[in-house]
UniProtKB/Swiss-Prot annotation:
It comes from the Bacteria. PROSITE patterns: RIBONUCLEASE_P. InterPro entries: Ribosomal_Su5_D2-typ_SF, Ribsml_uS5_D2-typ_fold_subgr, RNase_P, RNase_P_CS. SUPFAM superfamilies: Ribosomal protein S5 domain 2-like. Coiled coil: none annotated. Consists of a catalytic RNA component (M1 or rnpB) and a protein subunit. This is Ribonuclease P protein component. It comes from Aeromonas hydrophila subsp. hydrophila (strain ATCC 7966 / DSM 30187 / BCRC 13018 / CCUG 14551 / JCM 1027 / KCTC 2358 / NCIMB 9240 / NCTC 8049). It catalyses: Endonucleolytic cleavage of RNA, removing 5'-extranucleotides from tRNA precursor.
Length: 119
C-alpha cells in the first residue's frame, strides 16, 4: 500500500459482512462521544466503517460533519494503524464538540486502538 494519504474504496468497509465481523469480537477504544471497534483483517492496510445513527445526531448536517472529520482523521493517521477493520460509532455528545476537539479525540483513540491491537 502506498504511503500517500488517500481514502480510496479499498480503505472502506463496504458490506454488511465486514461490519458483522467487527461487531462479533471487537477490540474497543471509547470515549463518552465516540466508540471505536476493531478486529484484525487479512489485508496489508486498515479499513474504516462509519456508524452515525440518526437517534444520536438528528440533523443530517451534524451526521455529515462527524463523518467528514472522522474520514479526514483516518486518512491522515492510516499509516500509523495496523491491518485492522475499524467501525466508528458516534454518540450524542459528539454534536457538542467542535472539529478541532473531535480531531484530537480521534487521534487519541487511534493511538489507543493501535496499542491494543498490536500488543
Amino acid at each position: 500500500m502506498p504511503t500517500q494519504h488517500t481514502f480510496s474504496r479499498e480503505l472502506r468497509l463496504l458490506t454488511p459482512e465486514h461490519f458483522k465481523r467487527v461487531f462479533a469480537e471487537p477490540v474497543r477504544a471509547a470515549s463518552p462521544q465516540i466508540t471505536l471497534l476493531a478486529c484484525p483483517n487479512t489485508l496489508e492496510h486498515p479499513r474504516l466503517g462509519l456508524a452515525v445513527p440518526k437517534k444520536a445526531l438528528k440533523r443530517a448536517v451534524w451526521r455529515n460533519r462527524v463523518k467528514r472529520v472522522v474520514r479526514e482523521s483516518f486518512r491522515l493517521n492510516q499509516a500509523n494503524l495496523p491491518a485492522i477493520d475499524i467501525v466508528v460509532i458516534a454518540k450524542a455528545g459528539v454534536k457538542e464538540m467542535d472539529n478541532e476537539e473531535l480531531f484530537k479525540l480521534l487521534e487519541k483513540l487511534w493511538r489507543t486502538l493501535s496499542r491494543r491491537c498490536n500488543g
